[in-house]
Amino acid sequence: MATKRLARRLGLIRRKSVTPASGNPGGSRLKQLYAYLIVVDFESTCWNDGKHHSSPEIIEFPAVLLNTATGEIESEFHAYVQPQEHPILSEFCTELTGIKQVQVDEGVPLKICLSQFCKWIHKLQQQQTISFAAGDSEPSTSEVKLCAFVTWSDWDLGVCLEYECRRKQLLKPVFLNSWIDLRATYRLFYKRKPKGLSGALQEVGIEFSGREHSGLDDSRNTALLAWKMIRDGCLMKITRSLNKVLTKKNPKILARNLGTDQVEEAATCNMSIQGPSIYQKELQSTVNAEENAQMNSVCVNSSCIKGQLQPKSNMKADLYNIRHSFPLFTTKSSTSVDQLHSPTLNPPLTMQKPSKSDQLALNDSSKSSTLNSNLVLVSTTIPSVNHVSDVEMGHTFDCLPMLAEWEDVVLLPASQAEPDTDCMPPVSDTNVSTSLNSAERSLVPEEPETLSYENFEDLQETPQNSETSKSIVYKSPHSTVYDVKGAKHPGSDASAFKLPKCKPFPFTSVHASAAYPSVLRKDPLLSGGTKRNSLSPPASPRTKRQTFTIHEEKPTSSICSPGTTSCRVSPSVLTSTVNLQEPWKTGKMTPPLCKCGRRSKRLIVSNNGPNHGKAFYCCPVGKYQQDRKCCGYFKWEQTLQKERTNGKALSHSSEGLTFSSPETSRIHDRNLSFPIKNSLRLRPSMRH
């Protein structure tokens, strides 16, 4: 006995520590930061055949709640998890963990297990008033009791659960991103390396209770070891965290990357209205009831009138101004209406206080346009035809319900003061919509959208005083259609109009080239030198269409009509500026910049699952590089393609005057996502 006492006094023999029955162990303890510790110890699938297997899956999910003040285990959570990748356990796994195949077959998937675990945590938060902290903080108070997770090594939460959630694309709870590595804490506190959990318990004089490699038994023994270390004066602190921390390196790169992200977000949510100008507010204040039905399905393909409208007289001088105003087209793209409609460009004096009908038309046109347009002379939509129909429509002043059926027309006022042709502002070059709300002005339809499919070179225009040679083709209470074959407009000296082939591509915006004057000369409104009679305008009515029509994209369709055998194309008329060979269509796309300013890396999902084979971009910095930190950038390639597609389409729609056929324009409208609804709405004649 004396020898044992001497050996214990010299520290050669350690005596097993026994907690008194009162529950108050002896020894001085530091005040802990965390009032509760949740100890977890997962068991996963394993093999010993020497073959390469996939990552392990959790098959047992245990957790125990330890009170750091009393050392008692107040609550426990336990569930068996059904593996999905390898549902059959190996013999080695069954012998090591003691888990049988029947137990995992009756278990729940990891997703449901995490949901049950979160419910258990939520119940503890309500009963014990605990909360989780990402890192070290102030000690727990009587009101809020801090809690932290404890594991034996970083494998449980840092490797096993982390990568399984990534493979199965499960949302891991945020509070599982920080934990205390008890093995590392043990090594720092006792200054020695433990030989496993059972070896560490033996070194401090605690016998292992239960079965080794049983998840619940390992969690209980780990809690006993943590309590022993707390009694010995160890202060438990967070040792590992997966929460993203902003790096302090390269602040300029971070600022530049942040600005790039903001630009991309602005491009995806284009046409965001932040605050209209004073002139727009004045127009909007008079039409509160018309704002919900102001855009049609072709609101991005034809011109609208804003500001001063062109009168019907003095067309030759106006045509001269148009020819000289095309070089003045602006190509600067913008995404904000405030930037597009500059408040410094005041409207003419004649439009400072427009009438009610003018305000309705102006408000609808200004809403749908993306750049301010002060003059519109001709429709910017090229019909998908080769010949103009040789019929003429005569209408009275109250034929607005019928005219509302036609689209893509030019709106001219019945009477208005002639402007100064020397001070004509430049024409805007964007896709704008035609306003059909003014019921008090004369509407003149120009170049219908659906015309007869014949040779376009035999275009004929009928003078106003040729009604004696006409034969009535169609007559209604509002309009009369005559056959005017053989008549020819004396003032029309335009050459043959040739249209380019329409290639099947979702974006059909093209810029006007030097041949604009020849194109505009074809318009009967500009070629005629006299003012049209508003009661009988020589126009070609288009075939009536249904109010709601679903158009399908035809990849082999072109502008050429199905009845024609040949289609002549003049590349000098319209030149396409859209690159038909998009980089992402060919499989090559420049990787975007990640958050740390580096060029991201393109990877492909190789694991089994719903995203198998998908490509994504992530930070090129590896997670295990000590000198660098990964910024955590991640984006699917499909999402990036959609963002760049929208940005490409918006840039083309704002850089030049867009010409598009009716079929491709509908495809263009369907592919673009605008914040303003481009759904089918009631026509102006049906709103009242």
UniProtKB/Swiss-Prot annotation:
One MF term in the entry's GO annotations: zinc ion binding
Family: Belongs to the ERI2 family.
Protein name, as recorded: ERI1 exoribonuclease 2
Active site: 43, 213
Cofactor(s) it depends on: Mg(2+)
Residue stretches spanning the membrane: none
Annotated residues for binding of Mg(2+) 1: 41, 43, 218
Keyword list, A-Z: Exonuclease, Hydrolase, Magnesium, Metal-binding, Nuclease, Zinc, Zinc-finger
PANTHER family for this protein: 3'-5' EXONUCLEASE ERI1-RELATED, 3'-5' EXORIBONUCLEASE 1-RELATED
UniProt remark on cofactor binding: Binds 2 magnesium ions per subunit.
Organism, as annotated: Mus musculus (Mouse)
Database matches in Gene3D superfamilies: Ribonuclease H-like superfamily/Ribonuclease H
EC numbers for this chain: 3.1.-.-
